UniProtKB/Swiss-Prot annotation:
Top-level enzyme category: translocase
InterPro entries: NADH-Q_OxRdtase_suN/2 (IPR010096), ND/Mrp_TM (IPR001750)
Organism: Persephonella marina (strain DSM 14350 / EX-H1)
The keyword Methyltransferase belongs to this UniProt entry's keyword annotation: no
Chain ranges passing through the membrane: 19-39, 43-63, 78-98, 115-135, 166-186, 207-227, 241-261, 275-295, 303-323, 327-347, 374-394, 410-432, 455-475
Protein name, entry field: NADH-quinone oxidoreductase subunit N
Length: 489
């Protein structure tokens, strides 16, 4: 046996097969780098990106779950595979609608596509992280990529302002999380979630661990855009290209919630109940502030930005109920938010392409007469975000509500109901403007086929999952049970 073979056999070769989706996306990103320099064809670059994402999504089904690779730094369990699949599909729907939007703005930067893919890789690393080091690497890869995407409208001061605020607040979150990780490592001597869990319980929490947990919660809340760390959200969402806003509001948020759940269940399972009150306060503040400020918005895109802060509160409320039901509700709400969020923002993107459309609330006057189908789809998304049956948004809020009641957190359950009622003020306002007012313009509204397909697809699934939620709820319950049991490690 050669010296090289001896070294390899001694060290061990990581199982690269379990990261096949990540490899496909990485190769696609590097191909785009070369193609963008040589060809600069929008159609070719978009087609390559879509092909890579489809192949990556298909490869998820080829992976054997339960594998741990890279010396315990990367886990591929059912939880990570499901979230990876939905993150890839979310990115796919964003990408297919990016080209028509950029064409309408006469703005084209090929780097949009491969930076989105780098951000996606970071999110996929996040959801597969059983270790604070890999979690941090994935978090920063996705965050830095999104900083760039948020400021790609270089001549728009709103884009630059939003990106700058996001960069500053994101940098603060990075510093806070870094310090929290350092404190945890100093106390336990390990970055591994399960090792940390074996060394820390409710009987041996000292000042160092308490401080680390406070900092970790603050850092993660900042990344999730929870109140009072949400200040960057409306400006960053409003200034970014609307398909990118959809990516930021949905994919980045979902990946963050997946990480929060994995960290709390795997690294701190014995003290999650003691810290549930902190999550409950963040949830209540996000619901109250997000919904109240959304009431005052005249720009619908900015309104949906504050709405996303409120939805962060609904999801955090599920974390505040640290039970199997609560974790299932978190996973379920995270997955269904994809359909509501992508549908709503892509619909705005489609409308924004039209001449003199600024996403101001007055632009929606008479939309039902100018485009009956788009008005119907918008109504479905607004009803779902509000939580009106038979939409899936109702089932999501019902799951969180029942989890809170089961954990005797009545005050937060009441807050959820009251704030959902308050949110009717701005969700139904859009519906009233669409159906009860005369159009401000008679100009024809044009939409790309990909936009119509995406919006229709999301609207249909919002209704189907609202009427038949058992499949998604079953997936959520299974993932929650497996995560709590620690299966896959």
């Amino acid at each position: 046996m050669s010296i090289l073979q001896q070294l390899v056999s001694g060290i061990g070769v990581p199982n690269f097969g379990v990261i096949l989706p990540e490899i496909i996306i990485l190769i696609t990103a590097f191909i785009l780098l070369v193609v963008e320099l040589l060809i600069r064809s929008r159609v070719v670059i978009s087609a390559i990106t879509v092909t890579g994402l489809i192949l990556a999504a298909a490869s998820v089904f080829l992976i054997k779950k339960g594998d741990v690779t890279f010396y315990g730094l990367y886990v591929v369990d059912m939880f990570s595979l499901i979230f990876k699949l939905f993150l890839i599909l979310t990115t796919l729907f964003v990408v297919i609608n990016l080209k028509p939007y950029l064409d309408s703005k006469k703005s084209y930067y090929g780097e949009y596509y491969y930076i989105i893919l780098f951000a996606l890789i970071g999110m996929m690393i996040m959801v597969s992280s059983p270790n604070l080091v890999t979690f941090y690497i994935g978090l920063e890869l996705s965050a830095v990529s999104i900083y760039i995407l948020a400021g790609t409208f270089r001549k728009d001061y709103r884009s630059k302002e939003g990106a700058f605020k996001y960069l500053i607040m994101g940098g603060m979150g990075t510093a806070i999380i870094s310090y929290a990780i350092a404190l945890i490592y100093g106390r336990t001597g390990s970055f591994d979630f399960y090792t940390i869990a074996s060394l820390i319980n409710s009987n041996n929490i000292d000042v160092g661990i308490s401080g680390a947990l406070i900092l970790l919660i603050i850092g993660l809340a900042l990344k999730a855009a929870a109140v009072p760390f949400h200040f960057w959200t409306p400006d960053a969402y409003e200034g970014a290209p609307t398909p990118i806003t959809a990516f930021m509001a949905v994919a980045a948020k979902i990946a963050t919630f997946a990480v929060i759940l994995r960290v709390m269940v795997e690294a701190f399972p014995f003290i999650s109940k003691e810290w549930s009150f902190a999550w409950a306060i963040l949830a209540a503040a996000s619901m109250i502030i997000g919904n109240i400020i959304a009431l005052r918005q005249e720009n619908v895109k900015r309104m949906l930005a504050y709405s996303s802060v409120a939805h962060t509160g609904y999801i955090l409320a599920a974390i505040a109920a640290p039970t199997g039901m609560g974790f299932s509700a978190l996973i379920f709400y995270s997955l269904i938010y994809i359909f509501m969020g992508i549908g709503g923002f892509i619909l705005l993107s489609a409308l924004e392409k039209n001449h003199n459309w600024s996403n101001h609330i007055d632009d929606f006057k008479g939309l039902a007469k100018r485009s009956p189908m788009m008005a119907l789809f918008m109504l479905i998304f607004m009803f779902s975000m509000l939580g009106i049956p038979p939409t899936v948004g109702f089932m999501g809020k019902l799951g969180v509500f029942l989890a809170l009641i089961g954990s005797d957190i009545w005050w937060l359950a009441v807050t959820l109901v009251v704030m959902s009622i308050v949110s009717a003020g701005y969700y139904l306002r859009v519906v009233i403007y669409m159906y009860m007012y005369e159009p401000v313009s008679k100009a024809r509204l044009n939409f790309a086929m990909t936009e119509m397909f995406t919006v229709a697809f999301m609207a249909v699934f919002v209704l189907i999952l609202g009427i038949y939620p058992t499949v998604f709820w079953g997936i959520s319950t299974t993932l929650s049970s497996l995560l709590i049991a620690g299966i896959g490690r």
